[in-house]
From Swiss-Prot:
Biased composition (Polar residues): 377-388
Primary gene name: COL5A1
Effect seen on changing residue 1164 to L: In FMDMF; uncertain significance
Compositional bias annotation for Pro residues: 470-485, 687-696, 1106-1115, 1380-1398, 1454-1469, 1526-1541, 1560-1569
Compositional bias of kind Low complexity: 309-323, 417-428, 506-520, 587-597, 671-686, 722-741, 747-756, 867-876, 908-917, 971-990, 999-1011, 1088-1104, 1116-1140, 1259-1268, 1485-1494, 1542-1554
Phenotypic consequence of residue 123 to E: In FMDMF; uncertain significance
Native species: Homo sapiens
Impact upon substituting residue 25 to P: In EDSCL1; not or less efficiently secreted into the extracellular matrix
Family per similarity comment: Belongs to the fibrillar collagen family.
Domain Laminin G-like: 72-244
Protein name, as recorded: Collagen alpha-1(V) chain
Amino acid sequence: MDVHTRWKARSALRPGAPLLPPLLLLLLWAPPPSRAAQPADLLKVLDFHNLPDGITKTTGFCATRRSSKGPDVAYRVTKDAQLSAPTKQLYPASAFPEDFSILTTVKAKKGSQAFLVSIYNEQGIQQIGLELGRSPVFLYEDHTGKPGPEDYPLFRGINLSDGKWHRIALSVHKKNVTLILDCKKKTTKFLDRSDHPMIDINGIIVFGTRILDEEVFEGDIQQLLFVSDHRAAYDYCEHYSPDCDTAVPDTPQSQDPNPDEYYTEGDGEGETYYYEYPYYEDPEDLGKEPTPSKKPVEAAKETTEVPEELTPTPTEAAPMPETSEGAGKEEDVGIGDYDYVPSEDYYTPSPYDDLTYGEGEENPDQPTDPGAGAEIPTSTADTSNSSNPAPPPGEGADDLEGEFTEETIRNLDENYYDPYYDPTSSPSEIGPGMPANQDTIYEGIGGPRGEKGQKGEPAIIEPGMLIEGPPGPEGPAGLPGPPGTMGPTGQVGDPGERGPPGRPGLPGADGLPGPPGTMLMLPFRFGGGGDAGSKGPMVSAQESQAQAILQQARLALRGPAGPMGLTGRPGPVGPPGSGGLKGEPGDVGPQGPRGVQGPPGPAGKPGRRGRAGSDGARGMPGQTGPKGDRGFDGLAGLPGEKGHRGDPGPSGPPGPPGDDGERGDDGEVGPRGLPGEPGPRGLLGPKGPPGPPGPPGVTGMDGQPGPKGNVGPQGEPGPPGQQGNPGAQGLPGPQGAIGPPGEKGPLGKPGLPGMPGADGPPGHPGKEGPPGEKGGQGPPGPQGPIGYPGPRGVKGADGIRGLKGTKGEKGEDGFPGFKGDMGIKGDRGEIGPPGPRGEDGPEGPKGRGGPNGDPGPLGPPGEKGKLGVPGLPGYPGRQGPKGSIGFPGFPGANGEKGGRGTPGKPGPRGQRGPTGPRGERGPRGITGKPGPKGNSGGDGPAGPPGERGPNGPQGPTGFPGPKGPPGPPGKDGLPGHPGQRGETGFQGKTGPPGPPGVVGPQGPTGETGPMGERGHPGPPGPPGEQGLPGLAGKEGTKGDPGPAGLPGKDGPPGLRGFPGDRGLPGPVGALGLKGNEGPPGPPGPAGSPGERGPAGAAGPIGIPGRPGPQGPPGPAGEKGAPGEKGPQGPAGRDGLQGPVGLPGPAGPVGPPGEDGDKGEIGEPGQKGSKGDKGEQGPPGPTGPQGPIGQPGPSGADGEPGPRGQQGLFGQKGDEGPRGFPGPPGPVGLQGLPGPPGEKGETGDVGQMGPPGPPGPRGPSGAPGADGPQGPPGGIGNPGAVGEKGEPGEAGEPGLPGEGGPPGPKGERGEKGESGPSGAAGPPGPKGPPGDDGPKGSPGPVGFPGDPGPPGEPGPAGQDGPPGDKGDDGEPGQTGSPGPTGEPGPSGPPGKRGPPGPAGPEGRQGEKGAKGEAGLEGPPGKTGPIGPQGAPGKPGPDGLRGIPGPVGEQGLPGSPGPDGPPGPMGPPGLPGLKGDSGPKGEKGHPGLIGLIGPPGEQGEKGDRGLPGPQGSSGPKGEQGITGPSGPIGPPGPPGLPGPPGPKGAKGSSGPTGPKGEAGHPGPPGPPGPPGEVIQPLPIQASRTRRNIDASQLLDDGNGENYVDYADGMEEIFGSLNSLKLEIEQMKRPLGTQQNPARTCKDLQLCHPDFPDGEYWVDPNQGCSRDSFKVYCNFTAGGSTCVFPDKKSEGARITSWPKENPGSWFSEFKRGKLLSYVDAEGNPVGVVQMTFLRLLSASAHQNVTYHCYQSVAWQDAATGSYDKALRFLGSNDEEMSYDNNPYIRALVDGCATKKGYQKTVLEIDTPKVEQVPIVDIMFNDFGEASQKFGFEVGPACFMG
């Protein structure tokens, strides 16, 4: 035992007192009680010294400490720390003590309020907690639930989070808890716990927080101890955390294993990890020099060097003075003069001596007098904290002198000494351990007791400074002195007995609602595991331990789960979990690198005989296999080619002589081929020509076995004999050994197809072979399943312009366009029912074009228009997005073979397809070369082996003999050629694994597997070279309107087209003069409507036409006065074709329209006089294409208008089907050369398409080099006046431009002659009704007018009669591909092939049961072949025979019965990915678990999310030039040049013949400069076209090179940025700058986006009011907002001051629930309104945590009277009785048993009800009832 204290003997006992040796023996031997109070160091349990995540080392309480080299070590704890451990690690072998101390040295972050430590029971209820901060709380709840939360001890007026170090000691004793702060401030509180409280140690301890608390302890900590003794708290500053001028006791302060931190000398430095205190000393060690235990004690020798100091000095029994705050000096009073003097190096007194801590049973009311000499030292007596009473009156020192007996000591503390005192101890036993001068203690004669002297002044004794004088003579006994002055006040004693309970205090005010809990993550670390590629961690001790800890933690933390919480802070990486259940098959991964050759798998059971397979490629020679046992002799094979002469083998036993065979032809000497797998037994072949005499043949079956001869001596090898005839067929011998492979022979003829072999395991992927030559185009395969859409491809070259297609059905709503500048946003009106047709009003004055209004509601679809004349080719638009896949075109002619492409990467292995039909019989293969002869086995004992003769040729095949008895199983033979796939056989026994074969050459391409799962999009490939023109695409969607062009001059009136669909009513023109009635012209067929011309002057008012049939009901009411001119509305969609009314009155003569589509030449109409030029009206929307009109009367020529500005590019539409060829168009302007495209890969040459219609002859350009297309040139000079061109080909209707500014009103023209009716222009916007004009004279009957647009919604009219059924609509667009279906069932077998020649054998029967082995009969002579017998019952499988020739293909057998299930096969290929299940609700945060051990390496993770799009790849190599295609149609006209002066009118010339396609002309003059929209310099520099002059020269004419102007870069940059902006408008990214409207919208644009947080802007417009939401794409694209922190719920409590049936907002701690976005910002009302408008349904979860409280159904009564009620956002109350959209996902509270939870889901189409804003609780208020709740996010589904 270490000696850690020094004794100075200044005895107050009288010399000769006899009881001291027994007393000392008792005191020195008594094991102190604190052995049972070993401190439990929580910092060690939590592994602080290994610095887990969030823990770092820092300087502790003392920056310098006496006798230490460096400062104290503490640990800094940050928010990232997540530390927990099972409580049993603190108390592994005992229960948690009833009375205990918590000791800690800590510096909390200033202003923080968090729990330092929390202990939970197995159910997850907190039992003990210490909260640091202002007014710290000691949380304690025993097994009975006492005290309640309102009775937790609260230490007011104390601030533990002031940023300073504090030494905190908490003593829990009986029903009191005492907090001792910094060794001086002591506060005791009542702890209302049960008499025998129990703390469950089956839970966990959590450091630094509470489960679900958001507050986390932050600061520095040096010590955290639990001591199973309540008295330890009073000694904290002496024994555990002394002041800085005191050496550290033999205890590490925070379990730091660094030996240099505290102790720097001795053998055992740094070894103490648990506190070990020397509570008693061994008597044998007394007086000896101390032995160092954990560190040396240099001053220990002083203990034996004080012999002269032992003279008793009674006056020195006064205590040493107290030093402030226990500053490292012990104020110990010894009994007599045994004073405790602390060593300089060690400071390890016994912390809890029973004499020091007497409970005061003898005299509890006496004041404490430390100097009264009433204390008896045990190893050291510490009175600085003692609470001992003084002896009772009359029992002072005299009593001690005479009665210092064993009984006296016992009486001082009966509870303590009895168990330890040994009555057998004798004084003699103490001798060896006492100091040398111990006899002086007993010398002298006791005189009478003197008076007690005055109390002396306290001595100031510093350690090591005490100088002792010589002992003085003993004075006479004095009279009893007067009472001494009151000694210094002792430190506060232990708490006394529990007093009577005080009156209950007033209930405290409810605290503020706690913040929502964070999601605690189990901080497991995942360590390394098995080798890469292993399936998962092997089950290990670590894993089972982790499972046990997890299970324990789950039990410890099982509590009511909350609703979906916010994502918690990521925890540290934890250890791996236990192996999970096997997951769903993952997606097929990409082709991995070639793996290491795996071990051979076990052989499967033999399968049924399969069908014959096609010939496999000749394999490489196999390795030599082990020698097999001898098999039975097989049947003789067909004669083989002559082999090389073999080496002489060991002599075998002589066989019976064979018959001489005829000599056969010599075969070619070939190398040995690989033996094949056994094929099916073939037919008997024709007898071959006689072979040359062979060597002795194998034993035949014909002869009877001869008598066994004696073993002869071994003969010398004889010369090779003549080749004999093949011997008779012998019994099958044992299988011979496989010989070494021979040299490779010439390739044989293809053999007959063998039966298909069993499916082998998939081989390792071979290296990629060189790319093969591209094969010719095969016949089209069957339609495969629709694949997933591929990644967006590079834009293809412009295809041949097709003819105008028929009008498609209404497309899906496009993305919202730019928000228009003009127009007030009108409310969207519903489409009213059509009113009755009103009378035609007079034409009013033309109104000015108003600004475009917002788009109106969609009108009903119009009838399908007739096919119109093809329009003129439009200008090339900007590159649009790739159109959807068109319908497949007609196959063209076969193209030439393309160049060799680069090999593609192997695709993922497809699923196994169904078994195909059985193939026809293949050609007969050549007979394989016989293998080497095996060693002869002897049926009898082997004779001397003879020399091996040369191999003879194989004889002809004999007839099959009778089936022999089954022989012993042979060893595995070499693998044969692969046969065709056989039917699945019965499971064979597992054979030994064969050696791996070499990789064979690449086999033929297999059948196309089913479509694999959609892969992640690869990086975009390099653009391919321009392929052949593709088929015409569908018509593109309508582009955005271009900027308003300048008003054009009037064109000549077009031919009258057919009436178009009814357009919007045009503006009412001003009243015109009445014109003369013109003679009615011959009615021409209606032409297609031309573009709207300028409005003409008002014509005369015609007479009213005959009443038309009843039109759709119009707005009722009288005609109003003229209203103010409204803004021009946008073009509506085409309306339904209304019935054609009777001709109305003739309208005013319209202005000449622009050139209409050219109709076929009709009869000339009467020429009208030229009309006055009218005002230019705004162009109306283009009507649907009308049918090709018959030639109408020709109109008068109008003035050509000025050219308008070019509109914005529209998106490229899907190309429509090819139209009819139009007449040749005019020669277009030479287009500007475009920029050179990137070189694309050579496409496969497509089939030759049909030649396009002949285009008009283009101008012959100067033969230039095929240079890269240049940028648009600058504006050129106006050209000379050209002659009038020929009528051009009708182009597709152009995009409607925005309304141009109204032109100046023209002068009223003279009255013109009555002209022919002009073509109906597109309807203009509805103008205000004009005043009634004077009634005109009847005009000619006009053509039926265009149908007007739907009028403004009027009051509902009477229901009209039902209309006729409309024409069937056109087929819709191709839907998006559906998911890949499961593999279909096996198809039926193909058609049966032509019958083959009848085979001699029937088809193989089913495998029969194994027959009994028959007795072996003597082999008979081979008989003649008999007639074919009926198939016998199947015998047992014989041994493998020599492969026979392949037989004819038999008919397919009927399927056999299902075999027994085989053993588990290897894992199948991954199945198709299942449909995504609906995303579950976000789970409630789990409780914190324990840190487990690191696990094995986990399985390879799933494929990650697609990476960002890669940059464009390098330009590909030039492909092989394809064959020239047919001459394409003319390209589109170039960009328009500046308008030239008006040319003279030319006459129409005849159509010329189609010219050859000319070479590209020189670049046209530059076009007008466009507006520069903030060019992006990066893009500008990126889009700079650098043209290498050498390229141009290489290509030919260099003079075509045009130097770009500097401004072109800006134009290209602007175009590029515009393109990006438009792309982002169409496909928002969900960022703050580019938000989507809803998550559903985002999912539609980006189906691959993962769940997460994205920005949305439901009201669109400026994105500054966008907000971040959680997008749950897994659940279909729902948009989720979250309750704010204070609305997330409330902790479970009893709510004593609240009334049932009240709303939560009425609670004292309640409020209305409010919601925020994912960044915590409130969501605006307008945005929520729009979000609801964009949503079809919404859902939200509420979790109710209960303790004996009902949330929904009351299971006892079956009623819902106490169900929660919710207040929706629309102030609607919702509960079980009035809302069917609420359902309970979990209703654990219905039973009212213990802690449970109920999860309610509100999933409603009434989106205005969600989110909920208040909750009414109805079942609480009783003493045992508690509840809490959590509110989940509100998610809206579009």
